[in-house]
């Protein structure tokens, strides 16, 4: 190590960061993370909601095609949904099921139930019926959410 009796600042510059500089950088990083992470996770949830909405609408189109071929939404063989989960690949965020009311083969209700990382999503579970009505399952969504806000 070289001696710097006349210029101590020049010697210190080559040794790295001070503790104060490190704490300032860590604080700045923590503030950025506190702001950015919730926004990132909300965007991720919105993308998963968009995936399930697209899958529900495609399944509804399939059910209409099934009705055109069988004159009923139920029958033999029963309709097998092309998309029983959303997203289509990867981890399951929603499970999609179809229900045909007994005695009314001319109607159906598709329901997407939250699963995995979306189990606590405030938008709740999504539904689409034979008339194309897009709703949320009552009791599954937060008080500040409604179908218009979640189905966009």
Residue ranges of predicted features:
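Alpha-helix exit/C-cap motif
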Residues: 46-50, 61-79
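N-terminal leader/signal peptides at the extreme start of proteins
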Residues: 1-17
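Short, low-complexity, Pro/Ser/Thr/Gly-rich segments in the mature regions of secreted, periplasmic
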Residues: 144-152
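Membrane-proximal amphipathic alpha-helices
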Residues: 41, 45-56
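N-terminal single-pass transmembrane signal-anchor helix
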Residues: 12-40
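Extracellular/periplasmic head regions of type IV pilus-like filament subunits
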Residues: 69-133, 151-152
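Generic recognition of well-ordered alpha-helical segments
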Residues: 54, 58-61, 130
